Design a protein with these regions (language model features):
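Anionic N-terminal interaction surfaces
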Residues: 1-6, 57-59, 66, 82
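Non-transmembrane, membrane-adjacent beta-strand/coil modules in membrane-associated proteins
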Residues: 12-69, 90-91
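Nucleic-acid endo/exonuclease domains
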Residues: 9
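Cytosol-/stroma-facing membrane-proximal "stalk/adaptor" domains immediately downstream
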Residues: 67-91
Length: 91
């Protein structure tokens, strides 16, 4: 299952370890930062996604590295191009 999806102008988060709102309107997002963490001792590689909103709050979550998540992150700039959202890939 994918870590997130975008539909009807809303960013939906499907990850278990996200302790804030899981539905974020795209109009309220200022920046999405994506970082990559190597897996150590059998933990597996992960993507670390930080969503910064215009009101100053941030939401972060982890996604595992897989082919589906790689494709999802490659399509992210095209999915949010109608909104003034900066996407920072730090890997």
């Amino acid at each position: 299952m994918a870590g997130f999806h975008i539909a009807n102008g809303i960013f939906y988060i499907h990850v278990a370890f996200c302790f804030k709102k899981r539905r974020i309107p795209l109009a309220s997002i200022r920046r999405i930062s994506i970082d990559f963490m190597r897996g150590r001792k059998g933990g597996g590689a992960r993507y670390f996604v930080i969503i910064e909103q215009k009101d100053g709050t941030t939401t972060m979550f982890f996604m595992g590295k897989s082919k589906t998540n790689d494709a999802l992150l490659e399509q992210l700039p095209q999915a949010v191009q109608r909104y003034p959202i900066k996407i920072n890939k730090m890997y």
